[in-house]
Amino acid sequence: MPPRKAHTTRRTPAKKSGVRRRLLRLLVTGVPVLALCGVAWLWLESVRLTRIEIVGARQADPGELRRLAAVDSGAALFDLDPALIADRVARHPWVQAASVTRWPTGTLRIAVEERVPVVLQMDAGGRPLRYLDAEGYGMPPGRGPVPDVPLLYGVRGPAHPMRPLEDEPVRALLTTLAALEDPARALISEIVRAPDGEFWLYTTPAAGQRSVPVRLGREDFERRLRRLVAFWQQAVLTQPHKTFSLIDLRFANQIVVREEAHPSTQKSAMGHE
């Protein structure tokens, strides 16, 4: 068998020239890019914090938010951790969420989303104590406009400023109130939790009516408040000549009311539609 001939591949001058051209192009384009990246990195390292911008704070004091952020003026801006700063700011009672953006101009932008108050909790002496949101978190009176929310009496806590109320019936009621439309929410002036745990509402005086006590009970708040709104629109606002002294929502198939037609008082029951 004849021996095999070894084949070798030789690069032609044209191929060698093409490789050189590609290497040259890489050098021409790559070196400036690397240099530019280096300059950009050095420039970012040189950017210093010159301003802290607070956005979205209406009730929370911007000065307190800056203090919670705990960043020094003149610090290297892009060495700061946005997530860490946002977590610090979110410890403010009014702040539900926070986000932090670093701008090359030297500005640190802190945007906050504040909690929405549902009621104003009153202390045992009838003085404003704190606002409560839908989740049961407490917020102290803020610096902005006074929120128009019902007053809440007879409730303790929350025990910790960073934790919500542990009272489940109260939290259920707060969630229900937060979901109400504005006209329905405006119907409620005060909420009282009696020593036996039962909730009473007092309506906002309107249409010739005094504030009417409403017996809400201990549960099923969403359905009962819907029935109250429907009854108020259909039976109270349409009959301004009638004076109601009590509305009882505890029964499944009817709303029990007490009317004051004359000096005498009579009881009546109205079926729920």
From Swiss-Prot:
PROSITE patterns in alphabetical order: POTRA
Stretches of the chain forming a coiled coil according to its record: none
InterPro entries, per the entry: Cell_div_FtsQ/DivIB_C (IPR005548), FtsQ (IPR026579), FtsQ_C_sf (IPR045335), POTRA (IPR034746), POTRA_FtsQ_type (IPR013685)
Stretches in topological domain Cytoplasmic: 1-20
Domain of life: Bacteria
Segments passing through the bilayer: 21-43
Localization: Cell inner membrane
Domain POTRA: 47-115
GO annotation, biological process: cell septum assembly; FtsZ-dependent cytokinesis
GO cellular component: cell division site; plasma membrane
Keyword terms: Cell cycle, Cell division, Cell inner membrane, Cell membrane, Membrane, Transmembrane, Transmembrane helix
Annotated Gene3D superfamilies: Cell division protein FtsQ/DivIB (3.40.50.11690), membrane protein fhac (3.10.20.310)
Chief place where the protein resides: membrane
Residues in the Periplasmic compartment per record: 44-273
Family to which the UniProt record says this protein belongs: Belongs to the FtsQ/DivIB family. FtsQ subfamily.
Protein name, as recorded: Cell division protein FtsQ
Organism encoding this protein: Rhodothermus marinus (strain ATCC 43812 / DSM 4252 / R-10)
Name of encoding gene: ftsQ
